[in-house]
Amino acid sequence: MFPGTAASRAAEPRVGLPVELTDRPVLGANTATVVVVEISNFKCTQCRNFHENVFPTLRRDYIETGKVRWAVINASDDESEQYGKIFSLARCAHRQGKYWELLDGLFSVAHRAPSVLEALVAKSPLLDAGELEICLKDRSVRTAVAKDFEQAARLKIRGTPTFVISKWSADGTRTESTIAGAQSLEYFQRAFDALLKKP
């Protein structure tokens, strides 16, 4: 557990977060008093297992009920991986508003060769292939991916997945804790329930 930092306004719980939520995949109400920032790598087996076996229940019980807000930084502790096409593809899927719908597919093809990877994602009926092609050539996408890696580095992660959890109390004070690794559903449920009980 890390020392709490004061949020400037209790009514706006995103104030004081360790990373920016703008222009990244986010689910949940912005009034939630618990905000999770997940650092995830598409080539990480534990990350994939978490999203297949744990996240759906957390999404149903905590995110969709307005208790928890969930944001994702797609990165790793290896800076050289930022040049992998999978991260740009994820960014472009997000720009078309289809990140969450394509998440399982991105995990399943992440280890393929870049040219094959792009072709497979472009075939998705959820995406506009023309927009995807334009997006992948947009320098701002590469800049956004690099920024994701920079933010992950500032959080000093030592592996993926890592979950940075912020909790706001009624007086606007923020406390921060970290969960490392793809823990069980029960582990996350206990952690969230304990945080949500705090005033």
Role assignments for model-derived ranges:
Residues V35-E38, R69-V72, T162-V164, T178:
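Soluble periplasmic/extracytoplasmic beta-strand elements of cell-envelope proteins
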Residues V37-F42, T173:
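Acidic/histidine-rich, surface-exposed loop or edge segments in extracytoplasmic proteins
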Residues A32, S40-K123, L195-K198:
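Structural alpha/beta surface segment adjacent to cysteine/selenocysteine redox centers
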Residues M1-P18, T178:
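N-terminal targeting signals for export/organelle localization
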Residues V36, C44, L132:
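Residue-level signature of catalytic and energy-coupling elements of molecular machines
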Residues L17-V34, Y62:
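A short beta-strand-turn-helix
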Residues L21-T22, V54-P56, E150:
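Alpha-helical scaffolding within the catalytic cores
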Residues A119-P199:
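C-terminal cap of thioredoxin/glutaredoxin-like
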